[in-house]
C-alpha cells in the first residue's frame, strides 16, 4: 500500500467522524456554492456540482442546506460570499511536504490562520512552487467494499480511464486523471456500484516514511490546519505504516 493511500485512509476515517459531529458541514456547503457559481446550478450539467452534492449527502448534510447553497451559488438566492481559492505550501515535522487548499472570503485571515497553525505545530511556510512539484493532481474516488473484490471494481472502471485501484482495508481507492474522473464515476454508477466520494485531489510522487512519533506530530499539524474554517483540504506526502496508524487510532 502506498503512502498516499494510507494517508487517504486516515483522512477518510477522520472525515466520517467529523461529519457525524457536524464539523465538516460548512466546508461541504462552500464546495457546493462555489461549484454552482463556477459551472451553473444544474447538477445534471455540472459534474463538479453533482459530486459536491453527493459528498454532502453522504456526510448527512441536510437537503435544505444543500439546496440553499446551490441556489446561492447559482445566483437564485441572495447571500453568497465571494469565495477565493488559495493554495499554501510548507513543510511539517520530519520534512513532510504539506499543501494547504483554502476557500475563503478573507485572504488575510486565511493566511494568518495557516501560518499560526504551521508555526505552532512544527511546520514552516514555503515559497510557491517549492512543495507543489512533489504532488500531481489526480481524480480520486473512494468506495466501501460491500462484498466487492478489487477485480470487480477494476473491471467496471478500467475502460473509463482508471489508472489504479488500491485496497485500503475496508474500502477501495480509484485513481485516474482529473479529466477522467466523471467517466470513471459514471462507469461505477452504470455498474450499480455505490461510491463515497469523487474528487480531484493531490497525490504525492515521493513519500516520507514516519515512525510513531513523527506520525503523531504530522497528524497534529494536519488537525490544527483543518480546524480553520478557511482550510478545505490538507495534503501531505507522509507514509504512515499500518501498525502505527492502528496505534494512533486507538
Curated annotation (Swiss-Prot):
It holds the Pfam family Transcrip_reg. GO terms for molecular function: DNA binding. It is found in: Cytoplasm. SUPFAM superfamilies: YebC-like. Belongs to the TACO1 family. HAMAP family: Transcrip_reg_TACO1. This is Probable transcriptional regulatory protein Mkms_2298.
Amino acid at each position: 500500500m502506498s503512502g498516499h493511500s494510507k494517508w487517504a485512509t486516515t483522512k477518510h476515517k477522520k472525515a466520517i467522524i467529523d461529519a457525524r459531529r457536524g464539523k465538516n458541514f460548512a466546508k461541504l456547503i462552500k464546495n457546493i456554492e462555489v461549484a454552482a457559481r463556477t459551472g451553473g446550478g444544474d447538477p445534471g450539467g455540472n459534474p463538479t456540482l453533482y459530486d459536491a452534492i453527493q459528498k454532502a449527502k453522504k456526510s448527512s448534510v441536510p437537503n435544505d442546506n444543500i439546496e440553499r447553497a446551490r441556489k446561492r451559488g447559482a445566483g437564485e438566492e441572495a447571500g453568497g460570499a465571494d469565495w477565493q481559492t488559495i493554495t499554501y505550501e510548507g513543510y511539517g515535522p520530519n520534512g513532510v511536504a504539506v499543501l494547504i487548499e483554502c476557500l475563503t472570503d478573507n485572504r488575510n485571515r486565511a493566511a494568518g490562520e495557516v501560518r499560526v497553525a504551521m508555526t505552532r505545530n512544527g511546520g514552516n511556510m514555503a515559497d510557491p512552487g517549492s512543495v507543489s512539484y512533489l504532488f500531481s493532481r489526480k481524480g480520486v474516488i473512494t468506495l466501501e467494499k460491500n462484498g466487492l473484490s478489487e477485480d470487480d471494481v477494476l473491471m467496471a472502471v478500467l475502460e473509463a480511464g482508471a489508472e489504479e485501484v488500491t485496497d485500503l482495508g475496508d474500502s477501495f481507492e480509484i485513481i485516474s486523471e482529473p479529466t477522467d474522473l466523471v467517466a470513471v464515476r459514471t462507469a461505477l454508477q452504470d455498474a450499480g456500484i455505490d461510491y463515497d466520494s469523487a474528487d480531484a485531489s493531490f497525490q504525492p510522487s515521493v513519500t516520507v516514511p514516519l515512525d510513531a512519533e513523527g506520525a503523531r506530530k504530522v497528524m497534529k499539524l494536519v488537525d490544527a490546519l483543518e480546524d480553520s474554517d478557511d482550510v478545505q483540504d490538507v495534503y501531505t506526502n507522509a507514509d504512515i505504516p499500518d501498525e502505527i496508524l492502528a496505534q494512533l487510532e486507538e
